[in-house]
Every structure is written in structure tokens, then in C-alpha cells.
Swiss-Prot record:
Keyword Transport listed: yes
SUPFAM superfamilies: V-type ATPase subunit E-like
Designated gene of the protein: vha-8
Transmembrane helix as UniProt keyword: no
MF terms (GO), sorted A to Z: proton-transporting ATPase activity, rotational mechanism
Organism domain of life: Eukaryota
Locations listed in the record: Cytoplasm; Apical cell membrane
Originating organism: Caenorhabditis elegans
Name of the featured protein: V-type proton ATPase subunit E
């Protein structure tokens, strides 16, 4: 018995419905997979961007903290420098006052001859030369002439040799000098300053650390003195 057109049409419709259903299922499967991949990629991108944002803000926080530390360090250093400057200014004022009082020493007729003798002796003992040129203030010339024989005797006892001292009467020390002498030997190649000013500077360099301690107390960060 042959198949009627009606049956053929039914079979065709059935086959078409099956194909359409299968196609729809396949399309849904593709859509689902595509959506899943999209969500995975979206999640990855979101996480990546979140990580970048976190790293950005962490970097900014570190920069801000570093800047804060730098500013704090600068402020601390500036404070220390101001404190050190104030201390140095105070020490300088103490030494300036001592310098201004030097002129009073040479004006003390009772004390100055012994001091001047000591300065001459110190200079001669530093040089230990056979021939020495001595400069002094013009106002001290007569006193130096009086003291020199005794100084040379003392030098000979200490050194065991004699020294010829020539007084330079053409080039006196400045009148504003506080006092003392300058000595030279070997045509001026060797010079020794034995003035009150030079002795004060020498003493100042030696006692500045002690002056700092006396004025401001010991420095906990300092383990030695100059």
C-alpha cells in the first residue's frame, strides 16, 4: 500500500519539528556556553581592574607616607639646626666677650709683664732657633727689652744653647693688638704667633667642647671631644 501525500507531509513536518527543536537546543547550549565564558572573562577583567586599583592606592599610600616621613625628618633637622645655631651663637658670644676683655690684660701693669715674659718664652721654645726676629707692639718695646735677657737665660737653661734675638723696630704689631709677640726665623720661613689673641684662639679650640657641656649639658650622642 503506498504512502499518501498526507503521510508524507506529516513525516516532513515531524522531521522539521525535530530539526528545529535540535537546532534550538543547540543554540541554547551555545548561548549558555557563551554567557558562561562571558561571565568568566568579565569576572577576570573585574578582578584584574580591582587589583590594579588596589595597587594604585597602595602605591599612593606609600608615597604619602614617604612624603610625611620626609617632611617630619626635614622639620626635625631644621629644629636641630636652629638649636645648634643658637648654641654656636651663644658660645661665639662668650668667646667674643673674652676677646673684648683681652685689652684689659695688657693694661694691668701688675700682671702684664709676667704674662708677656711667658709669651716670649713660649715662642722661643717653640722655635728653638739660633737667630730669631721678634715683633711686638710699639708700646711694649721697652718692656720687651727689659724682659728679653731673663727670657734668653731661661731659654739657655731649658735648651742648652744660646739664641740671638733681633727686635724688629720697623714693623711693630698693630696698636689695636691686645699684646704679646710674634717671632720668626730663617728669613721669615718659620713663624710663631705668641700673642694674646692667638693664645685665646688656641685655648678656645681646646675648650669649646667643655664650654658646650658647661652651657648646655653633655651631648648623649657624643662619645669623644675635639
Amino acid at each position: 500500500m503506498g504512502i499518501s501525500d498526507n503521510d508524507v507531509q506529516k513525516q516532513l513536518r515531524h522531521m522539521m519539528a525535530f530539526i528545529e527543536q535540535e537546532a534550538n537546543e543547540k543554540a541554547e547550549e551555545i548561548d549558555a556556553k557563551a554567557e558562561e565564558e562571558f561571565n568568566i572573562e568579565k569576572g577576570r577583567l573585574v578582578q584584574q581592574q580591582r587589583q590594579k586599583i588596589m595597587e594604585f592606592f597602595e602605591k599612593k599610600e606609600k608615597q604619602v607616607e614617604l612624603q610625611r616621613k620626609i617632611q617630619a625628618s626635614n622639620s626635625l633637622n631644621a629644629g636641630r639646626l636652629r638649636c645648634l645655631k643658637a648654641r654656636e651663637d651663644h658660645i661665639g658670644a662668650v668667646l667674643d666677650e673674652a676677646r673684648s676683655n683681652l685689652s684689659r690684660i695688657s693694661g694691668d701693669a701688675a700682671r702684664y709683664p709676667a704674662i708677656l715674659k711667658g709669651l716670649v718664652m713660649q715662642g722661643l721654645l717653640q722655635l728653638l732657633e739660633k737667630e730669631v726676629v721678634l715683633r711686638c707692639r710699639e708700646k711694649d718695646l721697652r718692656l720687651v727689652e727689659q724682659l728679653l735677657p731673663e727670657c734668653l737665660d731661661g731659654l739657655q737653661k731649658e735648651w742648652g744653647s744660646t739664641t740671638k734675638v733681633v727686635l724688629d723696630k720697623q714693623n711693630f704689631l698693630p696698636s689695636e693688638s691686645a699684646g704679646g709677640v710674634e717671632l720668626s726665623a730663617r728669613a721669615g720661613k718659620i713663624k710663631v704667633s705668641s700673642t694674646l689673641e692667638s693664645r685665646l684662639e688656641l685655648i678656645a679650640n681646646q675648650i669649646v667642647p667643655q664650654v658646650r657641656t658647661a652651657l648646655f649639658g653633655p651631648n648623649p650622642n657624643r662619645s669623644f671631644f675635639d
